């Protein structure tokens, strides 16, 4: 299978390299060995080998991956892909509603994950059009700062306004100031709108990639084809590896250093410096820094794990911008990321003159400062900075204090717990815990003393066992009976009486395990039987005669004689009212 394909836009995208079947004898997920029945299957995203049950997930990958239709994915790739997909969809909806509220910008389309994977699920991008700027295209960064990472509260309206004004006030010729900043408090998202440069970033220029392609597919180092001759000079190899002209590298480096000095003068140590955060402005042939807001939102830098690693000198942590600048310089010349700083010794033949000595100076134990690095003769390139732009970049005192309080507050367990476990809170907790421990110790000592005084010499074993049980009971009841002075006095009672009175076990057992309900009493009357003749009302002569007439047809005459007896009972009827009314008249 060919490792590279071309999408509809004409950009070459490298697929994930499939591992050979012989390289894995068991599934990478369930660790079960492969057999004739349990066959090998490759994940289309990562290229690893799994069994059928561990890779039975199908999803449609973006066209940049070079596949069409649903493709087989492993469990981890499917979860991350679906999670990012849902996250991007929600961010796109938030951006649509937020941009619709402003009459200046119009939502165009969502973008793939063009940012670095270090941001995880906290950053996505979309395209918009500036209606007031002649319909120019803009890139909208949708940031979701987590509560543990953001040093200021998103629910504070004053902090929101201060963040917007501070970010818009940072103006410099080599810093791309946002056009607008929108804070969506309902969704805890921040929208930073910038001008879109078709040339992309410096990393796009190094890797010759499209700016809007996914991050994990466009930055793939491709080693140039070696010549037929086995021997090659160092000059020819340096020319093949130097992807950018040396003069352009010198000019860009000088501009980057000047922008870093401006940010340092405002109190921002821009540790988020890498080639993806340096855009190329072709109109005036300059480079401009972006994503300055990352320093004010507590997001981790790209080189955070490397700089704060074990065994690195303290000068690396004190000069974060210089270390990041050294990584950028190495990648602009060689064309691949540096990784560990000791790797520069492996590329000595590829460096131009004085560059290797400069990198050695940057990654030494005594790292130079920005002011010392700018004075290096290798950066002596004429650059003009307008004085008006520097005047526009001045900040107010309130904005400088906001930067001082919130800049470079990286997300870490210590930083996230600083609000709840401050020094004052720790002192309060320690004092309260010491008081509780002292009270408990005093109670235990009092209990043991009383029992030791009461117990006799012959009954030492019993007296040694009693304090442990009663002290536990007293400690448990002291929490609920702090205001009752009689509760601790139970320890002065004799051991036999304390054992009976102190543990209230019988009511607890009665409440939780009640006796079974008593059986129904025997004297209770049984359910009523069907009505019998004994309980019927007394029979009347009319009824008896009626029954006899039913039985014997000869009793019809008797029924006629007994009918007058029933008339007084029916005197209440409506016919009896007529004669009474006539008498009154």
Curated annotation (Swiss-Prot):
Q: Residue ranges of region Disordered?
A: 426-585
Q: Which GO terms describe its molecular function?
A: actin binding; protein kinase activity; zinc ion binding
- Tell me which residues bind Zn(2+) 1: 27, 30, 51, 54
Residues engaged in binding Zn(2+) 2: 43, 46, 74, 77
Every copy of the Protein kinase domain together lies at 108-478
Locate the compositionally biased regions of type Pro residues. 513-532
In terms of Gene3D superfamilies, this protein maps to: Transferase(Phosphotransferase) domain 1, Zinc/RING finger domain, C3HC4 (zinc finger)
Where along the chain is composition biased (Low complexity)? 426-456, 466-503, 533-542
Q: Which domain of life is it from?
A: Eukaryota
Ranges annotated as FYVE-type zinc finger: 21-82
Q: Does the keyword Metal-binding apply?
A: yes
Instruction: Return the domain comment text from this UniProt entry.
Output: The protein kinase domain is predicted to be catalytically inactive.
The protein here is known as Probable inactive serine/threonine-protein kinase slob1
């Amino acid at each position: 299978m060919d490792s590279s394909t071309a999408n509809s836009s004409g950009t070459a995208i490298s697929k994930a390299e499939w591992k050979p079947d012989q390289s894995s004898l068991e599934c990478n997920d369930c660790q079960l060995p492969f057999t004739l029945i349990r066959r090998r299957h490759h994940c289309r995203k990562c290229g690893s080998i799994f069994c059928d049950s561990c890779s039975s997930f199908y999803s449609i990958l973006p066209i940049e991956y070079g596949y069409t239709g649903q493709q087989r994915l492993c469990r981890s790739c499917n979860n991350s892909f679906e999670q990012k997909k849902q996250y991007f969809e929600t961010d796109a909806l938030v951006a649509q509603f937020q941009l619709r509220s402003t009459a200046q910008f119009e939502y165009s389309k969502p973008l793939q994950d063009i940012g670095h994977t270090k941001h995880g699920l906290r950053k996505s991008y979309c395209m918009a059009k500036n209606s007031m700027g002649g319909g120019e295209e803009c890139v909208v960064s949708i940031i979701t700062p987590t509560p543990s990472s953001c040093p200021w509260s998103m629910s504070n309206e004053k902090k929101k306004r201060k963040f917007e004004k501070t970010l818009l006030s940072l103006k410099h010729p080599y810093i791309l100031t946002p056009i607008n900043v929108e804070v969506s408090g309902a969704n805890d998202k921040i929208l930073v709108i910038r001008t879109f440069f078709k040339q992309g970033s410096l990393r796009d220029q190094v890797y010759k990639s499209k700016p809007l392609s996914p991050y994990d597919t466009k930055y793939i180092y491709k080693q140039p084809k070696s010549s037929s001759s086995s021997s090659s000079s160092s000059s020819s190899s340096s020319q093949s590896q130097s992807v950018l002209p040396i003069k352009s590298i010198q000019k860009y480096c000088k501009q980057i250093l000047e922008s870093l000095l401006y940010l340092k003068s405002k109190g921002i140590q821009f540790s988020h410096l890498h080639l993806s955060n340096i855009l190329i402005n072709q109109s005036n042939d300059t480079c401009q820094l972006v994503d300055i807001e990352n320093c004010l939102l507590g997001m981790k830098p790209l080189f955070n794990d490397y700089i704060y690693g074990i065994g690195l000198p303290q000068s690396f942590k004190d000069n974060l911008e210089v270390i990041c600048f050294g990584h950028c310089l190495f990648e602009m010349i060689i064309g691949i990321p540096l990784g560990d700083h000791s790797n520069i010794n492996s590329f000595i033949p590829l460096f131009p003159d004085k560059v290797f000595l400069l990198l050695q100076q940057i990654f030494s134990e005594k790292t130079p400062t920005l002011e010392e690095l700018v004075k290096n003769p290798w950066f002596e390139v004429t650059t003009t900075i307008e004085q008006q732009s520097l005047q526009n970049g001045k900040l107010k005192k309130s904005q400088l204090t906001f930067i001082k309080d919130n800049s470079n507050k990286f997300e870490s367990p210590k930083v996230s717990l600083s609000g709840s476990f401050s020094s004052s809170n720790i002192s309060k907790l320690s004092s309260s815990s010491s008081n509780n421990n002292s009270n408990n110790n005093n109670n235990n000592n009092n209990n043991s003393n009383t029992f030791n005084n009461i117990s006799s010499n012959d009954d030492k074993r019993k007296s040694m066992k009693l304090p442990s049980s009663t002290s536990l009971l007293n400690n448990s009841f002291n929490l609920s009976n702090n205001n009752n002075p009689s509760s601790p006095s139970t320890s002065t009672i004799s051991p036999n009486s304390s054992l009976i009175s102190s543990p209230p076990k019988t009511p607890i057992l009665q409440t939780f395990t009640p006796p079974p309900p008593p059986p129904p009493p025997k004297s209770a009357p049984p359910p009523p039987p069907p009505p019998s003749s004994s309980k019927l009302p007394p029979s009347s002569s009319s009824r008896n005669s009626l029954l006899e007439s039913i039985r014997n047809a000869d009793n019809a005459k008797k029924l006629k004689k007994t009918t007058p007896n029933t008339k007084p009972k029916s005197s209440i009827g409506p016919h009896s009212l007529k004669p009474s009314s006539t008498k009154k008249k």
